[in-house]
């Protein structure tokens, strides 16, 4: 019994592994001067993860102005009073330090550039704020790329009837005009007017396109399609957007497959409240 009494309990030498405990951090100094740090943590799934980092310490000596070094040692005041020296990440944004090194003859180069390109620079300054504007739908794209160039007339374009002059006067260069000089057909009177148009695939859209104004900036093409498809099949929806903000510019074009559906939609949707604004709906100008 005495032997058994002097014998240590086997449970005293047994180490119990606590699943919630993490091993201590291990720091090893390598021969090349770097340090290897091994640590443990739990991931989002609750599993133990081993993290190994290798750190190299570099000492950088900087020569600064004595007055700058003195200002850095000042005690902070105001909302930063009591904080440690140096910039705080929550209140200070540290940008890249850009060193300006002018060339030896930078004054001469600047004078030559101002002398040679003065006029060009002024033209650039005049055109830098200019934006591309479509003559058909007033959108920020070229007129040749307008999706409604075949179905709408340009804004504020006079009609062909308004340009007609004296119909009784003979055309310049025609036979019997009283002159022997020949004038090519494209320079004769009336040549500037457009010829007869053949009915194309956009001829039907030309008659069934609605112009919707006073549209909210937060509008979407899908929402407009859902609003107008209640009156008939919609073939095309164009919502003008700002190129920089991608927000609606306040107007849109809705094309229907049938003009009767477009007329019914124009009657019902004109004055309709959409996103706290009253829509203005009318038929788009027909292309001449």
Curated annotation (Swiss-Prot):
Cystine crosslinks = none
GO CC, sorted alphabetically, is: eukaryotic 43S preinitiation complex; eukaryotic 48S preinitiation complex; eukaryotic translation initiation factor 3 complex, eIF3e; eukaryotic translation initiation factor 3 complex, eIF3m; multi-eIF complex
Q: What assembly does the database describe for this protein?
A: Component of the eukaryotic translation initiation factor 3 (eIF-3) complex.
- Protein family: Belongs to the eIF-3 subunit G family.
Q: What broad class describes the main subcellular location of this protein?
A: cytoplasm
**Where do the record's region annotations for Disordered lie?**
1-33, 156-197
Where is this protein localized, as stated in its record?
Cytoplasm
**Domain RRM, residue spans:** 208-286
Task: List keywords of the entry alphabetically.
Answer: Cytoplasm, Initiation factor, Protein biosynthesis, RNA-binding
Organism of origin is: Aspergillus niger (strain ATCC MYA-4892 / CBS 513.88 / FGSC A1513)
Quote the protein name from its UniProt record: Eukaryotic translation initiation factor 3 subunit G
User: Which PROSITE patterns does this one have?
Assistant: RRM (PS50102)
- Biological processes per GO annotation: formation of cytoplasmic translation initiation complex; translation reinitiation; translational termination
SUPFAM superfamilies from the xrefs?
RNA-binding domain, RBD (SSF54928)
Q: What does this protein do?
A: RNA-binding component of the eukaryotic translation initiation factor 3 (eIF-3) complex, which is involved in protein synthesis of a specialized repertoire of mRNAs and, together with other initiation factors, stimulates binding of mRNA and methionyl-tRNAi to the 40S ribosome. The eIF-3 complex specifically targets and initiates translation of a subset of mRNAs involved in cell proliferation. This subunit can bind 18S rRNA.
MF terms (GO), sorted A to Z: RNA binding; translation initiation factor activity
């Amino acid at each position: 019994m005495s032997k058994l009494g002097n014998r240590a309990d086997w449970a005293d030498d047994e180490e119990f592994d606590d699943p919630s405990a993490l091993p201590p951090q291990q720091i090893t100094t390598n021969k090349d001067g770097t340090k290897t740090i091994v640590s443990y943590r739990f991931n989002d799934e609750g599993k133990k993860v081993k993290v190994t980092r290798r750190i190299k310490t570099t000492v950088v000596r900087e020569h600064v102005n004595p007055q700058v070094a003195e200002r850095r040692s000042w005690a902070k005041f105001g909302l930063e009073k009591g904080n440690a020296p140096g910039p705080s990440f929550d209140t200070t944004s540290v940008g890249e330090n850009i060193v300006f090194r002018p060339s030896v003859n930078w004054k001469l180069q600047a004078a030559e550039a101002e002398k040679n390109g003065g006029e060009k620079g002024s033209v650039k300054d005049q055109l830098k704020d200019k934006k591309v504007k479509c003559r058909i739908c007033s959108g920020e794209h070229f007129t040749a790329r307008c999706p409604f160039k075949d179905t709408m007339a340009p804004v504020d374009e006079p009609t062909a009837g308004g340009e007609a002059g004296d119909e009784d006067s003979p055309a310049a260069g025609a036979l019997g005009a009283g002159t022997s000089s020949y004038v090519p057909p494209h320079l004769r009177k009336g040549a500037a007017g457009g010829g007869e148009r053949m009915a194309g695939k956009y001829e039907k859209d030309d008659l069934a396109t609605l112009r919707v104004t006073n549209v909210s900036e937060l509008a979407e093409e899908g929402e407009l399609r859902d609003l107008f498809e209640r009156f008939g099949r919609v073939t095309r929806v164009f919502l003008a957007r700002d190129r920089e903000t991608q927000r609606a510019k306040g107007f849109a074009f809705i094309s229907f497959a049938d003009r009767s559906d477009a007329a019914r939609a124009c009657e019902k949707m004109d004055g309709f409240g959409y996103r706290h604004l009253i829509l203005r709906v009318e038929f788009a100008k027909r292309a001449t």
